[in-house]
Amino acid sequence: MNTMIGFIVLLVSATVLGDPELDALRKELDERFDMEFKDGPMSEIQEKLFLQELEALDSELLEDDPQTDTYENSNFREKRCSGSDTPCYKGSKMCCRGLECTEPALYGIWYKSYFCKRPKKG
């Protein structure tokens, strides 16, 4: 019981006294905000000029960056395709590069489907 009374007294004293630095921090932030914007907000013309300058700088930086091309190309991948000995539909182009959708061979007869195979050189 004595312990609970002690904690309650501590809680009440902490809430009453509070954080004295909190008011000082608020005042400091208000002063900084006033110093930053003491000239008032920018006019629309100034904002547009500033935006144009930023866009020009941005475009110059991106043009000189050699990594943008390689980054875009590294994410490119071929469309999904069927590998060797995988079923396909007659006349479809779903087989990977270098493979053709050919008539079923021995085991393909059982499944009645075509398979992606390398073309026979002849």
Curated annotation (Swiss-Prot):
InterPro entries: Toxin_22
Tissue distribution of the protein: Expressed by the venom gland.
Gene Ontology MF annotations: sodium channel inhibitor activity; toxin activity
Subcellular location: Secreted
Keywords of this entry: Cleavage on pair of basic residues, Disulfide bond, Ion channel impairing toxin, Secreted, Signal, Toxin
Signal peptide: 1-18
Propiece residues: 19-80
GO cellular component, one term: extracellular region
One of the Pfam families matching this protein, by short name: Toxin_22
Disulfides per UniProt: 81-96, 88-101, 95-116
Stated role: Probable ion channel inhibitor.
Entry remark concerning the domains of this protein: The presence of a 'disulfide through disulfide knot' structurally defines this protein as a knottin.
Name of the protein described by the UniProt record: U19-hexatoxin-Hi1a
Organism: Hadronyche infensa
